[in-house]
């Protein structure tokens, strides 16, 4: 009799767990949504002692564009991420977010960019301790007036994994800062994987900021964050093809186009060989850009000095041990 009671109790517990799992799966799929194409607001920022914003962009002048993936304020040198085979799923503390965001902004500020692009900037996330990280970015343009554009990349349902410290629900986006006036901006939706994989691929987009030039044409500035952790690199290639088609249309209309961001691609084409590391088992998506993807008229500019090779991204399965180059700080 006692044995039957134990079996019945265990059966009820298992049934309850099964119901919870089913309800969670229903919640995740029901909560999943895509933001879609939309116009974006341009915010003009200034302080009491700020130098007035510079006039329209001049042709023939030299301008500096920076790009940095903020990694939701988590990626200190010794941080490892669970999706890369590491151990951690969130920033370690509010203090860690503060220190990392200040460090990223200080580095970018030191470059004195005319245009600064940021990716994976959380506005409200479990993984980033619900800190609005956009508040840090204005310091990158300290001392001058500037325009700011924010595009929400994704608004994910609660990811109950890893079980001990779930990644949680996260709202994250991309931010563009400009010392020159931005006339208008828009969000463009990118294709993502289908089925269950779309829950890991999240939502993806790029923002388009239109900046007038003295010649009457526009500087069209693209800020992007392509897919990572997909089954292979095919979807990011498809996204890149869409971006290139958009840029080529602007180029043929006489406008000037620059795209920067986190490509989640091996931009050098042979990063493991260059940096003397073995490709990790989780690196199936960080593939070289297939030949012919970038059309004539557009050029891929990779920040790389062959005499002094420095990777733009480290693999995150171990604390700051292995490095690759995909023009991003994380994914």
Segments and roles (model prediction):
Residues 323-329:
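Conserved small/polar residues in nucleotide/adenosyl-binding loops
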């Amino acid at each position: 009799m006692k044995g039957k009671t134990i079996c019945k109790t265990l059966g009820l517990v298992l049934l309850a767990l099964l119901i919870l799992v089913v309800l969670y799966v229903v919640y995740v799929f029901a909560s999943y949504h895509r933001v879609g194409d939309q116009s974006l607001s341009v915010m003009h920022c200034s302080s009491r002692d700020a130098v007035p914003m510079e006039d329209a962009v001049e042709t023939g002048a030299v301008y500096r564009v920076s790009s940095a993936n903020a990694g939701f304020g988590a990626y200190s040198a010794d941080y490892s991420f669970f999706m890369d085979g590491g151990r951690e799923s969130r920033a370690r503390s509010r203090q860690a977010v503060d220190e990392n965001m200040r460090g990223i902004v200080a580095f970018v500020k030191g470059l004195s960019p005319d245009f600064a692009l940021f990716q994976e900037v959380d506005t409200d996330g479990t993984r980033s301790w619900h800190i609005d990280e956009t508040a840090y970015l204005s310091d990158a343009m300290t001392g001058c007036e500037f325009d700011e554009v924010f595009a929400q990349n994704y608004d994910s349902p609660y990811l109950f994994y890893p079980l001990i410290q779930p990644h949680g629900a996260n709202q994250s986006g991309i931010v563009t800062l400009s010392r020159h006036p931005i006339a208008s901006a828009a969000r463009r939706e990118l294709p993502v994987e289908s089925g269950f994989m779309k829950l890991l691929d999240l939502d993806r987009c790029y923002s388009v900021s239109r900046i007038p030039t003295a010649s009457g044409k526009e500087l069209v500035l693209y800020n992007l964050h392509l897919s990572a952790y997909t089954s292979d690199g095919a979807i990011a290639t498809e996204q890149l093809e869409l971006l290139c088609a958009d840029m080529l249309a602007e180029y043929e209309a006489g406008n000037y186009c620059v795209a920067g961001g986190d490509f989640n691609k091996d931009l050098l084409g042979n990063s493991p060989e260059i940096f003397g590391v073995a490709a990790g088992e989780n690196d199936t998506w960080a593939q070289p850009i297939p030949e012919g993807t970038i059309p004539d008229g557009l050029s891929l500019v990779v920040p790389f000095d062959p005499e002094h090779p420095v990777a733009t991204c480290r693999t995150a399965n171990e604390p700051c041990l292995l490095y690759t180059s995909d023009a991003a700080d994380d994914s």
